[in-house]
Amino acid sequence: MNFRTQVELPKEETEIRHSDRIMLFGSCFAENIGNLLLANKFRCDVNPFGILYNPLSVAEAIRQTLSYKTYNEADLFCDRAGWHSFMHHGSFSGNSAEECLLRINERLGRAAAELPQTDWLMITWGTAWVYSLKENGKVVGNCHKQPDKLFTRRLRSEERRVGKECQIWC
């Protein structure tokens, strides 16, 4: 007796090899897949900005990586918990601006050097909801538990999501 449905998939012409370079951007799914690939000795760069869920944050992270952006103190904000970037996961936060900037710029520099040599780029989007700062309209990748009154929340339509993200490659 068979207790599961078996699905036969055709073999792909192109397969990921251990010698390939892989970069992943996006949600916790990208993080988990990337960590599994690393555990199995694949050459991966996983989420250079940390986990990002919405398509616009992922697109902006890729744009910043391609342009070799360097962060400075004006790109950060400070609260009682330390220094943070709205574009980065909390793992990049620091007790000082210098500590936070060192983590961000070191990681971004590695990703910027790696991206042009990448054979596979994997992108996962976790939500169509986008948060932006009310004060300047900039999309954020992480709210860092800041008050919701600082942000505007909006739902991206399918056409707008695909159109905006496709601009990454133009």
What does each of the following model-derived ranges do?
Residues 1-72:
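Serine-esterase "nucleophile elbow" of acetyl-processing enzymes
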Residues 21, 120-122:
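Structural motif
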Residues 31-34, 86, 129-133:
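Short catalytic/ligand-binding loop motif for oxyanion handling, primarily in non-cytosolic enzymes
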Residues 67-111:
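A basic- and aromatic-enriched beta-loop-alpha substructure that forms the phosphate/nucleotide-
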Residues 93-98, 102, 142-161:
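Surface-exposed cleft-lining segments at the edges of enzyme active sites
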Residues 116-117:
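Alpha-helix C-terminal capping/helix-to-coil transition sites in glycosyltransferase folds
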Residues 124-150:
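A short mid-domain helix/strand-loop element embedded in enzyme catalytic domains
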Residues 159-170:
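Single conserved hydrophobic/aromatic residue that forms the stacking wall/gate
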